[in-house]
Curated annotation (Swiss-Prot):
Assembly and interaction partners: Part of the 50S ribosomal subunit.
Protein name in the entry: Large ribosomal subunit protein uL24
BP-aspect Gene Ontology terms: translation
Organism ancestry: Bacteria, Pseudomonadati, Pseudomonadota, Gammaproteobacteria, Alteromonadales
PANTHER family in the record: MITOCHONDRIAL RIBOSOMAL PROTEIN L24 (PTHR12903)
GO CC annotations, alphabetized: ribonucleoprotein complex; ribosome
GO molecular function, one term: structural constituent of ribosome
Species this protein is from: Shewanella denitrificans (strain OS217 / ATCC BAA-1090 / DSM 15013)
Cysteines engaged in disulfide bonds, as pairs: none
């Protein structure tokens, strides 16, 4: 099945501590989760490793967020939207359900 949300898509968060924020998807995981730039930041306590040149301390990194908690952002309407699929010229393409415009 084709992915409704892909890398580099602009999304809006629907639920959680970052609700309402917009950002770009940096990675789509096979478990149905996304890594989104600047969203769902967690603090990780990093142990120093001199052999690898890694300094220790508390670092902030992006944790995965469930796909169901985000929606693709439609620039034309300025709102969250749903994704549909259709065939055009023998190719499967994604489109916004609200105004039928193609995504990218």
């Amino acid at each position: 099945m084709a992915a409704k949300i892909r890398r580099e898509d602009e999304i809006i968060v629907l639920a959680g501590k970052d609700k309402g924020k917009r950002a770009k998807v940096s990675q789509v995981l096979p478990t149905g989760k996304l890594i989104v730039e600047g969203i769902n930041l967690v603090k990780k306590h990093q142990k120093p490793n001199p052999q690898l040149g890694v300094t220790g301390g508390v670092i902030e990194k992006e944790a995965p967020i469930q796909t169901s908690n985000v929606a693709i952002f439609n620039q034309a309407t300025g709102k969250a939207d749903r994704v549909g699929f259709r065939f055009e010229d023998g190719k499967k393409v994604r489109f916004f359900k609200s105004n039928s415009e193609l995504i990218k």
